[in-house]
């Protein structure tokens, strides 16, 4: 039943959604759940060398019933700054139940976003990290997905909110494009298909990301693309199937269009209907639009436009079916199949764009020409 409902939504047209019911506001996410953070200095065993080392800045969840923690995080080097604080790399520790040397180093890594409560209070009107935590916990229900960033632990103390996540060691996909200039089509397809799997998971959960971009795709050590940054996402409304009211994705019905909202996201990637902010929009369609822009940049090495507005001559050319002509003028031609896919995903009218299911069965996506698994850039970086 759930799979049938997903397929119906993944193939639904804008017209289908207009007939599903009146536009609605996004649904709220559930309340974020947090554990109590305990920060200690302790002895740690290196199981490879047998050495004991006293280390500082070990964080774990303090359970009310005082049962032993499941794991701990040895917080290490700074990876980057973020709006509310800093992101750091962590080493996962295993509890040994030994009073003298209570922890043991493992090969596991994590990243922690350390957010100041003071900063959260000051800037919550701009961006709400509590909502991002709620969304990530919602997305992670039922287990981690390989192509969407999930949550390991969410802890707090008097000063900080601590969001622990899987560690991605190879930077973001935008860095790969910058290094390469542009991708050969087999490499672009390799990444694009993984991004589509991430979108599929979000759609199955009834979530619109709203900020899809190459900068928001991290790459792990196994060359897996992971969608990150759910700070702007929306929980899509669905028809309740009975009274004409609004339900969530679990209703197994068609989703509704969403009432206009203030535009957000990175300018290159925002769809024209969201930029205008005058008419209802389809949450899934705007993510697919941004994904098409991502594919364009991977294949061409440049963004298609600054803003998807009539005033931009590049947008006007693509909107009128001239994508291939524009690329010939740039001396950046791509295959006819790739151009066909992009042209059909980047139609100005959302009623004419491809659905997720149509994108997945497009001949360019299904092409079996293959290609080598891409290599990471020469430096390691985690960007969240």
Summary of predicted features, one role per range:
Residues 154:
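Activation-segment/catalytic-loop signature of the eukaryotic protein kinase fold
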Residues 149, 158-166, 174-175:
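A conserved loop-to-beta-strand element in the N-lobe of protein kinase catalytic cores
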Residues 86-119:
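Glycine-rich ATP phosphate-binding loop
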Residues 347-352, 356-372:
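Terminal C-lobe "cap" of eukaryotic-type protein kinase domains
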Residues 2-68, 76:
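Juxta-kinase regulatory segment immediately upstream of eukaryotic protein kinase catalytic domains
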Residues 203-220:
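Catalytic-loop of the protein kinase fold
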Residues 191-192:
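Activation segment signature within eukaryotic-like protein kinase domains
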């Amino acid at each position: 039943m759930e799979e049938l409902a997903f397929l119906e939504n993944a193939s639904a047209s804008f017209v289908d959604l207009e007939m599903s019911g009146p536009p609605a506001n996004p649904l709220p996410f559930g309340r974020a759940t947090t554990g109590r953070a305990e920060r200690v200095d302790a002895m740690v065993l290196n199981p490879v060398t047998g050495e004991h080392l006293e280390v500082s800045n070990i964080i774990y969840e303090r359970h009310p019933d005082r049962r032993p923690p499941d794991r701990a995080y040895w917080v290490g080097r700074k990876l980057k700054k973020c709006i509310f604080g800093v992101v750091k790399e962590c080493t996962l520790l295993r509890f040994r139940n030994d009073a003298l040397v209570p922890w043991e180093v493992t090969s596991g890594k994590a990243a922690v976003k350390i957010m100041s409560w003071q900063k959260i209070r000051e800037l919550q009107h701009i961006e709400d990290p509590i909502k991002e935590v709620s969304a990530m916990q919602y997305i992670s229900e039922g287990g981690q997905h390989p192509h969407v960033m999930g949550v390991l632990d969410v802890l707090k103390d008097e000063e900080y909110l601590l969001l622990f996540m899987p560690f991605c060691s190879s930077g973001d996909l935008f860095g790969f494009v910058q290094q390469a200039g542009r991708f050969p089509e087999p490499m672009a397809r390799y990444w694009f298909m993984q991004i589509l799997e991430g979108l599929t998971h979000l759609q199955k959960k009834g979530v619109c990301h709203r900020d899809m971009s190459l900068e928001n795709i991290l790459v792990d050590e196994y060359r897996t693309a992971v969608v990150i940054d759910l700070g702007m996402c929306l929980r899509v409304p669905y028809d309740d199937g009975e009274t004409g009211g609004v339900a969530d994705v679990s209703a197994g019905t068609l989703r509704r269009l969403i009432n206009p909202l203030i535009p957000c996201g990175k300018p290159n990637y925002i769809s024209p209907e969201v930029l205008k902010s005058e008419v209802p929009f389809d949450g899934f369609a705007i993510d697919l639009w941004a994904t098409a822009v991502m594919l364009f940049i991977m294949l061409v090495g440049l963004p298609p436009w600054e803003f998807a507005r009539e005033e931009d001559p590049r947008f006007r050319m693509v909107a009128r079916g001239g994508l291939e002509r524009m690329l010939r003028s740039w001396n950046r031609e791509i295959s006819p199949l790739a151009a066909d896919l992009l042209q059909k995903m980047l139609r100005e009218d959302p009623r004419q764009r491809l659905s997720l299911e149509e994108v997945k069965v497009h001949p360019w996506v299904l092409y079996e020409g293959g290609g080598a698994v891409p290599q990471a850039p020469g430096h390691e970086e985690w960007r969240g």
